[in-house]
């Protein structure tokens, strides 16, 4: 057992060294109990690009809540940790660091550069694990994985080769998304589309015979040197007679044909479209239909190549300006039409993505997607929480395109394909025998290896691996809705293809962490929050409590320090009531407390308030467990908060003082037993959310660790509806008296007369038998409980279920003075309402002020109106008394 709880809750003291003690005790490893049902989670591997953010903290907190609860419930739990090499993101970070040193990856060469990246990985992997420790994550480090581990690399190679042999991986030349900064291909979902201010540049392409010009509009005039044709719709009467003729490409002064193709929309623009097959996906298809050449006019870094005359070597956007100026100079520019249009940007580097003709590796998605869709119609389907994300998943799968999986990077899984001087290609899990073979320099998309994470981490392709047999498929995946397609869908179709089973039974989807104003956290806004800073100020338990209670599954959560203050205050409340209970414990052990509580349940000992709290504890255990099973942690947290703060601390603990301050030692032992027993169950219910503070308090009265303590279950013997109903009526009576005092501004310290009238003989008997509690909480000078009590003429009255309560006001209150005070208060609220109403009726203020400022004024207005209405009601009550 630990030392006595300190007088003040200090999270830094509570959490210091605790995580290492858990690790030393091996409490996070699977139990190994073959009779226990396995429950496994694989952590969504964070990128080794830097420190974890609040989103990671949220994601991992939810997983830890699940795994800690299941561990306490007796499951054989495995939470497998690991990290992702994050190809393009990590390489970009390392290249940025090298640029600061004045060198590039090309200066170093591939091997030396990769050495630098591994050094980066080791540095940030250490940082991430330190942060996991600060968060209290109960992962099994003995099974830690990395996506470039040899075991995982073996799985990647096998999957690639198997899909290639089935014809589902192929190599081809297509238009892909190209990141000129990273110099690599991107998949469609790695491209973020943003509305930007741009322009349509209208220019004339003169017919070969000079008889007329055709006006063409484009947003990318710099690509005109790659034009190999212009297209018109074959049904467009304006141009169909021109099909087969030639036009002169401005500046280049070369002839290109006019083709008829339905890609040209007569209703859009001029109805004439420039065709640049090497730089536009639609033009690429037109080019294939008409057997047109493909002319690439751009280097891989976004500069113009040698085919563009004096513009060669220019950055694409500088070239755009120069080309437009040249068009204007030669009289080919018709007009520039400003407009906002959607432009693709690289998710990783932020630069504008360039459509580019390139030879890449692709995964053919047709059958893989069909398999994933079909699985959702079976009994073994993946359950999404909330269910609406099943539709999101199916929508992605039904509209999926072939997946470009090759990346022009050095950091990652190098594609297992080799070429020789004879133009032969070999694809295999190992290098081909003999000399003269060169491996493909490209690496695989990071998501290709991540898609295998649930089963490759368990030892696959070694299907006889103990972990694979025991813990796969995994039980639950926790992740954000922003990567359902990036990751979740790919894990599902790869797992179905290679293991014949879904990768997980459940997918819990959470939202995004936003700032107090509802904005997404980003570097550009400067509103990001470092979870380690929050932990330093409030402690990990407070952050975890906030994150678990912030929202429902699938919903975003808004971070605020006000909410963090509330979280800390709640833990401080738990600390204080625990300290009170343990200081008044009298050396009681948990075993003795358990025996005494059994006597309370059977009616051998204790009083009605003891039976009431045990009944409510039972209900709390049932509701919390039910909501945990549905991943409704916010609902479970609300139930716990209400039980702990309201029912246990504010009522039961206060009610027990009647016994603890008495001279009856037998009653004291029973009360102490119920207090300790209930506290113990509360701590066990809370442990998965607040691991540090619950362990600290648990250690004051119990041996071992709460990590492996049994989770509370419902005890049918505690069900006592009569006790529950009776004490709730008692609470209603006490609340009614307190509220009446407040309404007429009578201090709690001033003794008053309380009359309780009830025609319910059982209730009358109950109140009379528990009159000591009523007196303790209401401070009566005179208390009468009876079935026949005439209503006093000048009195406040309240009605509760089964009874009416009167507070005579004679000699207690000067009604005239109270009316005057209330009238003055009413005038104050009216003045505040007038001021805020004037501001909100000002159209200029509403239009120009920040939305959060306007909302703040609206909140003020609602608050003042509520206070005004309450004051009016009190005035009406006072006026009735005067009559």
UniProtKB/Swiss-Prot annotation:
Its main location: cytoplasm. GO terms for biological process: valyl-tRNA aminoacylation. Its EC number is 6.1.1.9. It is found in: Cytoplasm. Keywords: Aminoacyl-tRNA synthetase, ATP-binding, Coiled coil, Cytoplasm, Ligase, Nucleotide-binding, Protein biosynthesis. The keyword Ligase applies. A motif ('HIGH' region) lies at residues 46-56. ATP binds at residue 523. InterPro entries: aa-tRNA-synth_I_CS, aa-tRNA-synth_Ia, Anticodon_Ia_Val, M/V/L/I-tRNA-synth_anticd-bd, Rossmann-like_a/b/a_fold, tRNA-bd_arm, tRNAsynth_Ia_anticodon-bd, Val-tRNA_synth_C_sf. It catalyses: tRNA(Val) + L-valine + ATP = L-valyl-tRNA(Val) + AMP + diphosphate. Catalyzes the attachment of valine to tRNA(Val). As ValRS can inadvertently accommodate and process structurally similar amino acids such as threonine, to avoid such errors, it has a 'posttransfer' editing activity that hydrolyzes mischarged Thr-tRNA(Val) in a tRNA-dependent manner. ValRS has two distinct active sites: one for aminoacylation and one for editing. The misactivated threonine is translocated from the active site to the editing site. The C-terminal coiled-coil domain is crucial for aminoacylation activity. Monomer. This is Valine--tRNA ligase. The lineage of its organism: Bacteria, Bacillati, Bacillota, Bacilli, Lactobacillales. The gene is valS.
């Amino acid at each position: 057992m630990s030392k006595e709880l300190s007088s003040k809750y200090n999270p830094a003291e509570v959490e210091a060294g605790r995580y290492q003690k858990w690790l030393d005790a091996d409490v996070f490893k699977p139990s190994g109990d073959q009779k226990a049902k396995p429950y496994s989670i694989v952590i969504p591997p964070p990128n080794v690009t830097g420190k974890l953010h609040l989103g990671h903290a949220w994601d991992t907190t939810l997983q830890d809540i699940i795994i800690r609860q299941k561990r306490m419930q007796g499951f054989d739990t495995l939470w497998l940790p690991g990290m992702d090499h994050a190809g393009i993101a990590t390489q970009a970070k390392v290249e940025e660091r090298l640029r600061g040193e004045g060198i590039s990856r090309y200066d170093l060469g591939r091997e030396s550069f990769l050495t630098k990246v591994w050094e980066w990985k080791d540095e940030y992997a250490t940082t991430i694990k330190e942060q996991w420790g600060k968060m209290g994550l109960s992962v099994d480090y003995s099974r830690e994985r990395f996506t470039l581990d040899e075991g995982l690399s073996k799985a990647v190679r096998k999957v690639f080769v198997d899909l290639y042999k089935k014809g589902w991986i192929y190599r081809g030349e297509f238009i892909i998304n190209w990141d000129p900064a990273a110099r690599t291909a991107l998949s469609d979902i790695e491209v973020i589309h943003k509305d930007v201010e741009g322009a349509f540049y209208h220019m004339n392409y003169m017919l070969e015979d000079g008889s007329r010009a055709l006006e063409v509009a484009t947003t990318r005039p710099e690509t005109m040197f790659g034009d190999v044709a212009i297209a018109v719709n074959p049904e467009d009467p304006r141009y169909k007679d021109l099909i087969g003729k030639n036009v002169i490409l401005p500046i280049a002064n070369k002839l290109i044909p006019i083709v008829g193709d339905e890609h040209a929309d007569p209703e859009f623009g001029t109805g004439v479209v420039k065709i640049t097959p090497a730089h536009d996906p639609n033009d690429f298809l037109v080019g294939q239909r008409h057997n047109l050449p493909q002319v690439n006019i751009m280097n891989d870094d976004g500069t113009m190549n040698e085919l563009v005359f004096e513009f060669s070597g220019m950055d694409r956007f500088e070239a755009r300006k120069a080309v437009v100026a040249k068009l204007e100079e030669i009289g080919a520019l018709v007009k520039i039409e400003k407009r906002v249009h959607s432009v693709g940007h690289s998710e990783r580097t932020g630069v504008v993505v360039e459509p580019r003709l390139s030879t890449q590796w692709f995964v053919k998605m047709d059958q893989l997607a069909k398999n994933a869709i079909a699985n959702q119609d079976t009994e073994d389907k993946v359950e999404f929480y909330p269910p609406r994300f099943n539709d999101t998943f199916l929508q992605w799968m039904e509209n999926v395109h072939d997946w470009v999986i090759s990346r022009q990077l050095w950091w990652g899984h190098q594609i297992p394909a080799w070429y020789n001087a004879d133009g032969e290609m070999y694809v295999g899990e190992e290098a081909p025998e003999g000399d003269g073979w060169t491996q493909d320099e490209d690496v695989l998309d990071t998501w290709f290896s991540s898609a295998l994470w649930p089963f490759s981490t368990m030892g696959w392709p070694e299907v006889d691996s103990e972990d694979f047999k025991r813990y796969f498929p995994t039980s639950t995946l926790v992740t954000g809705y922003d990567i359902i397609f990036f990751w979740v869908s790919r894990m599902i179709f790869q797992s179905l293809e290679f293991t014949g089973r879904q990768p997980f039974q459940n997918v819990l989807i959470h939202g995004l962490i936003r700032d107090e104003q509802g904005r997404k956290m980003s570097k550009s806004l400067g509103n990001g929050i470092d979870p380690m800073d929050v932990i330093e100020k409030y402690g990990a338990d407070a952050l975890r409590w906030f994150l678990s209670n912030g929202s429902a599954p699938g919903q975003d959560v808004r971070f605020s320090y006000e909410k963090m203050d509330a979280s800390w205050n709640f833990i401080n409340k738990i600390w204080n009531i625990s300290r009170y209970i343990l200081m008044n414990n009298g050396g009681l052990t948990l075993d003795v407390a358990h025996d005494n509580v059994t006597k309370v349940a059977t009616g051998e000992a204790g009083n009605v308030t003891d039976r009431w709290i045990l009944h409510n504890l039972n209900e709390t255990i049932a509701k919390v467990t039910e909501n945990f099973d549905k991943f409704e942690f916010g609902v479970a947290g609300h139930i716990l908060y209400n039980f702990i703060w309201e029912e246990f601390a504010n009522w039961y603990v206060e009610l027990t003082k009647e016994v603890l301050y008495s001279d009856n030692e037998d009653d004291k032992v029973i009360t102490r037993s119920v207090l300790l027993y209930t506290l113990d169950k509360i701590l066990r219910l809370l442990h998965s959310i607040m691991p540090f503070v619950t362990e600290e308090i648990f250690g004051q009265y119990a041996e071992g660790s709460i990590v492996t303590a049994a989770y509370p279950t419902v005890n049918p013997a505690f069900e006592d509806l009569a006790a529950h109903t009776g004490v709730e009526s008692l609470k209603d009576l006490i609340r009614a008296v307190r509220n009446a005092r407040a309404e007429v501004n009578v201090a709690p310290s001033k003794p008053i007369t309380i009359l309780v009238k009830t025609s319910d003989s059982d209730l009358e008997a109950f109140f009379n038998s528990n009159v000591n509690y009523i007196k303790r909480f209401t401070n009566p000078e005179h208390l009468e409980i009876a079935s026949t009590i005439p209503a006093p003429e000048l009195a406040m009255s309240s009605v509760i279920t089964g009874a009416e309560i009167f507070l005579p006001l004679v000699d207690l209150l000067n009604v005239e003075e109270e009316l005057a005070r209330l009238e003055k208060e009413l005038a104050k609220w009216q003045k505040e309402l007038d001021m805020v109403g004037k501001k909100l009726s000002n159209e200029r203020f509403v239009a120009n002020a920040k939305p959060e400022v306007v909302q703040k004024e609206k909140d003020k207005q609602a608050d003042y109106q509520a206070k005004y209405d309450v004051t009016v009601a009190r005035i009406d009550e006072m006026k009735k008394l005067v009559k």
